[in-house]
Amino acid sequence: MRFKVRLTRDAEADLDRLFDFLLERELSRDGADLSLPTQAIAALRSGIATLKTSPFTCRKAGQSPFLRELIVPFGRSGYVALFEIEDETNVAVLAVRHQLEDDYH
């Protein structure tokens, strides 16, 4: 079974926020790696794409069996994508955060 995966506006805004954070951090460092923000977003999008085939393998988030979290490793840490399995064919990514952030919003 294949699922259609969509990112909500909030999730897209989270990707923009994470990109901007990494870019600003790298610009302030000696020996900056300006490809890092692009690599991070590519890793996130690649991880999110796995939800097309296996959303039920991700850990549950809260009481609903349809609200789940995808862990996307990157560097020494990674990211967490909160998503909802809406029905038998649709998955919505609701939010994305760095693993070291306390919460989604």
Enumerate the language-model features and the residues they cover.
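Enriched for short, Lys/Arg-rich terminal
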Residues: D30-G31, V72-H105
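Basic, Lys/Arg-enriched alpha-helical interface segments
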Residues: M1-R68
